[in-house]
């Protein structure tokens, strides 16, 4: 009986350790490696390009510091079943045509950041509004 209890406790302990894995962080390039950020509103197509290094650093930092992993998976090139979203494209210094994208959108009164095939994170509404506000400047 003691052996059975010991094995049961060991299995539960291992299960708890594996179930409490580290939360995945959004993967963005270093601001110094980015030459331009392009924000495009879908479906309108309104676009703004940001090349000022201080503003690029602020956007990258705001997204990195204000996202929380939802555990959701991204299986598409862009958000599925979301009609209106922002595409935030990052263009890098090191290779011509090398870029990455994060989609920002609102769904059921919550705001999200999604990286294709990587994951979905909650993003603070203030950051979402600040980035989307750049289209109106």
Task: List each language-model region with its residue ranges.
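Bacterial signal peptide processing site
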Residues: 21-23
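Positively charged n-region of N-terminal signal peptides that target proteins for export
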Residues: 1-9
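Short, well-ordered, aromatic-rich surface patches in folded extracellular/luminal domains
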Residues: 92-137
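Post-signal-peptide N-terminal segment of Sec-exported extracytoplasmic proteins
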Residues: 39-75
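C-terminal motif of bacterial Sec signal peptides marking the signal peptidase cleavage site
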Residues: 16-19
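Short, structured surface segments that line ligand/substrate-binding pockets
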Residues: 69-109
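N-terminal helix-cap/turn-to-beta initiation motif at the start of protein domains
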Residues: 25-34
């Amino acid at each position: 009986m003691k052996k059975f209890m010991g094995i049961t406790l060991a299995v539960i302990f291992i299960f708890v350790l594996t179930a409490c894995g580290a939360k995945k962080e959004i993967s963005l390039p270093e601001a110094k490696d980015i030459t331009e950020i392009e924000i495009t509103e879908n479906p309108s197509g309104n676009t703004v390009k940001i090349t000022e290094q201080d503003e690029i650093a602020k956007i990258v930092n705001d997204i990195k510091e204000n996202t929380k992993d939802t555990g959701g998976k991204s299986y598409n090139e862009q958000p599925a079943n979301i009609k209106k979203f922002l595409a935030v494209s990052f263009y890098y210094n090191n290779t011509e045509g090398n870029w990455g994208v994060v989609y920002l959108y609102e769904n059921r009164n919550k705001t999200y950041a999604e990286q294709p095939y990587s994951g979905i994170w909650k993003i603070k509404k203030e950051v979402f509004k600040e980035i989307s506000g750049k289209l109106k400047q």
